[in-house]
Design a protein with these regions (language model features):
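Alpha-helical segment proximal to the catalytic Tyr-Lys
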Residues: 131, 175-179, 238
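Conserved glycine-rich cofactor-binding loop
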Residues: 12, 19-21
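Substrate-binding pocket helix/loop in short-chain dehydrogenase/reductase
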Residues: 102-103, 107-115, 210
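Active-site loop immediately N-terminal to the catalytic Tyr-X3-Lys motif
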Residues: 104, 151-157, 179, 217, ...
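Short C-terminal tail/terminal secondary-structure segment
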Residues: 2-5, 151, 230, 241-262
Length: 262
């Protein structure tokens, strides 16, 4: 019975940004739940190993080139994905980037890189895929946000702006597309050890600092997202839309002491 609740057999999921890191973990979780995948990267050759890994799980994986900063690339990917499977059920908008600099050092190009990738790209990929979902009256769109969707951090101005925008965008699209049977939610990880931020975890004082503020006292590991992504992609999330699900070990509680240790 439990397996039936979260069974994605027969579903087709697009996961963007799957050449490495978090996108691959999310794709694995969906494949293990039974979904067939479309996997994307700016360099399609970078997807070969991951494609074989998904096929070894007994699922299909169609690799497609995608640059989320290029409108024509988005349209080509959406058309090719729909042609490959005949339908698209699930979209995981995972492709993203970051620039870590003091706000006074952020350049025009830095800002555009992050916002174009994380926010504009997220919208136009969702738009392109929704056009294929609407005729079928069904869809699950999961935008990958961050704890920075709800909190600001020094040195991350463009990233925080983009992820805050993702949260608001999620609510707007949920309102727009709900009548068509499409749910739109935001999955927002906290401080996770990923390739994108591995340099932070080489700094032991920083690790101690951040873990002290996480009630569960450890950074997230990518597999901590497995249950959340499968739930949001499944039939069991049918009445959940427009929401931001924080998977952050509790850091969003504020996680500061109101008492002093004796």
């Amino acid at each position: 019975m439990v397996n039936e609740f979260f069974n994605l057999s027969g579903r087709v999921a697009i996961v963007t940004g799957t050449s490495r890191g978090l996108g691959q973990y999310l794709g694995r979780a969906l494949a293990r739940a039974g979904a067939d995948l479309v996997i994307t990267s700016r360099d399609k050759t970078a997807l070969t190993d991951f494609q074989h890994e998904i096929e070894d799980l007994g699922r299909r994986a169609v690799p497609l080139e995608l640059d989320v900063r290029n409108y024509d690339s988005i349209q080509r990917m959406a058309s090719a994905a729909a042609e490959a499977y005949g339908k698209i059920d699930i979209l995981v908008n995972n492709a993203g980037c970051n620039v870590r600099k003091p706000s006074l050092d952020i350049s025009w190009d830095d800002w555009n890189l992050v916002l174009d990738t994380n926010l504009r790209g997220t919208f136009f990929v969702a738009q392109a895929i929704a056009r294929h979902m609407i005729p079928n009256g069904y869809g699950r769109i999961i935008n990958i946000g961050s704890v920075t969707s709800v909190f600001g951090y020094a040195g991350l101005a463009p990233y925080c702006a983009s992820r805050g925008g993702t949260k608001q965008l999620t609510m707007s699209l949920a309102d727009d597309w709900g009548p068509h049977g499409i749910t739109v939610n935001c999955l927002a990880p906290g401080w996770f050890k990923t390739e994108q931020n591995k340099v932070l975890y080489e700094n032991e004082p920083w690790v101690r600092y951040i873990c002290d503020r996480i009630p569960l006292k450890r950074p997230g590991q990518p597999h901590d997202l497995d249950g959340a992504i499968v739930f949001l992609a499944s039939e069991e999330s049918r009445y959940v839309t427009g929401q931001t699900l924080l998977v952050d070990g509790g850091i969003s509680t504020g996680a500061t002491k109101a008492t002093v240790d004796e």
